[in-house]
């Protein structure tokens, strides 16, 4: 489980935007609000160390987030940041409503059926537009579990377990 100060990978700087030093970031989760709420972000350096940067402004532009970092005023000052991964501290994330979870909290959870059958662990999450899909692997098999209320019947982050009630045939694919 993540600690409150652990860094969480949120996206990647894929380009600059304009001439005033804005960075174009693709969020990995398809969710913009977390990045938009950050006051400080961390970018991976060439040696994989994380450098912290204060956020001046953040806005959504098409399917990306445009970040303006304090102290950078033109494109030439930020070109070296393109290609870096963007991280934030877990304790900076805005609170969620009951029953909502951040992807970083779900990755690694053990998944069992309501009958007690162990399916494996959540290894990745796919954003489909209508609902997320959890990719659960046990080493031999892979299950694609849609994130729907009637299928995901329980999540216990403290115990590290997600309980699912799969529809008929879901686990046969």
UniProtKB/Swiss-Prot annotation:
Q: Which InterPro entries match?
A: PRC_barrel-like_sf, PRC_RimM, RimM, RimM_N, RimM_N_sf, Transl_B-barrel_sf
Gene Ontology biological process terms, A to Z: ribosomal small subunit biogenesis; rRNA processing
Cited function: An accessory protein needed during the final step in the assembly of 30S ribosomal subunit, possibly for assembly of the head region. Essential for efficient processing of 16S rRNA. May be needed both before and after RbfA during the maturation of 16S rRNA. It has affinity for free ribosomal 30S subunits but not for 70S ribosomes.
Q: What's the superkingdom here? A: Bacteria
Q: What species was this sequence derived from? A: Geobacter metallireducens (strain ATCC 53774 / DSM 7210 / GS-15)
Cellular component, GO annotation: cytoplasm; ribosome
Subcellular location field: Cytoplasm
Under the heading Pfam families, the entry gives:
PRC_RimM, RimM
The UniProt entry, under HAMAP family, shows: Ribosome_mat_RimM (MF_00014)
The domain-related comment in the record is: The PRC barrel domain binds ribosomal protein uS19.
Q: Which UniProt keywords apply?
A: Chaperone, Cytoplasm, Ribosome biogenesis, rRNA processing
Q: Which residues form the PRC barrel domain?
A: 98-170
GO terms, molecular function: ribosome binding
Please report the name of this protein according to its UniProt entry: Ribosome maturation factor RimM
Q: Which PANTHER family match?
A: RIBOSOME MATURATION FACTOR RIMM
């Amino acid at each position: 489980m993540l600690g409150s100060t652990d860094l969480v990978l949120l996206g990647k700087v894929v380009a600059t935007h304009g001439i005033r030093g804005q960075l174009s970031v693709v969020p990995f989760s398809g969710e913009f609000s977390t990045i938009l709420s950050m006051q400080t972000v961390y970018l991976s350096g060439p040696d994989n160390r994380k450098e912290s940067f204060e956020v001046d402004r953040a806005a959504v532009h098409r399917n990306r987030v445009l970040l303006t970092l304090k102290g950078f005023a033109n494109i030439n000052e930020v070109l070296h940041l393109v290609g870096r991964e963007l991280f934030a501290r877990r304790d900076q994330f805005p609170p969620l409503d009951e029953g909502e979870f951040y992807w970083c909290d779900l990755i690694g959870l053990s998944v069992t059926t309501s009958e007690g059958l162990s399916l494996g662990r959540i290894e990745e999450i796919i954003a489909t537009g209508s609902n997320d899909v959890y990719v659960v692997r046990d080493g031999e098999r892979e299950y694609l579990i849609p994130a729907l209320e009637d299928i995901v019947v329980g999540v216990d982050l403290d115990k590290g377990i997600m309980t699912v009630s799969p529809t008929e045939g879901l686990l046969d694919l």
